[in-house]
Amino acid sequence: KAMDVFKCKFGQGFGMTETVAVICLMTPEEHIRALNEKPELLKSCGRPALDTQVEIRDENDNPLPVGEIGQICAKGPQIMKGYWNKKEESEKALKGGWMHTGDAGRMDEEGFVFIQDRIKDMIVSGGENIYSTEVEAALFAHPDVVDAAVIGVPDEKYGEVVKACIVKKEGSNVTEDDLISFCKDRIASYKKPQSVDFIDEVPRNASGKVLKKVLREPYWKDQERQVS
């Protein structure tokens, strides 16, 4: 509809300050193909840009096969040489000559990359990886949820469990049990929130990014794990 109204074409790119330019690009032609033939591609940030290599790697820095979720890593002439006066951070980010983006994602058989979540926002509960964005998407489908952020909080049995921080619609009577049950019908049971906090506002920075560190800190301050 927007393409018809504004008489324009859409593209999609993915990059970060450390990569200077994009590392993945979905061209206008690929966008049109997605609209007409393969709508799931609209969730992709595209394929590796010109002269750029992109791989999905596991926690041991090994390349993963098609469809598996891991860290998005990139290599190319546009990648930074390092952080100014931060040797240790530079070596970690550029391990093996590949930029480790900190983003979790997967690649399909055509090379299209799909971003799943930030690695640091992934919740590991009882050995299962839970991506906060998936749980948040389920919560946002509830008509009484105005805003939502999902975090992991300490749990003696599972290491950490899912907690939802919710801003509900004014005058809503929705309860913790209502939202947990709502999620259970939409995502795997082990991914559903184990608890819900109702808050007045989800903390965000100037660019609108959710400050999950602020939400996590009260729960992790007495734990050995470092909040990042």
State the predicted function of each range:
Residues 15, 46, 103, 127:
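Active-site glycine-centered loops adjacent to acidic/histidine catalytic or metal-binding residues
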Residues 24, 32, 47-51, 62-92, ...:
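Conserved ATP/PPi-binding loop(s) of AMP-dependent carboxylate-activating enzymes
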Residues 217-228:
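Acidic/polar alpha-helix N-cap and adjacent early helical turns
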Residues 76, 81-82, 89-92, 104-191, ...:
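AMP-binding/adenylate-forming catalytic core of the ANL superfamily
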Residues 39, 53-54, 104, 201:
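Generic short beta-strand
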Residues 1-40, 53, 60-63:
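Gly/Ser/Thr-rich phosphate-binding loop
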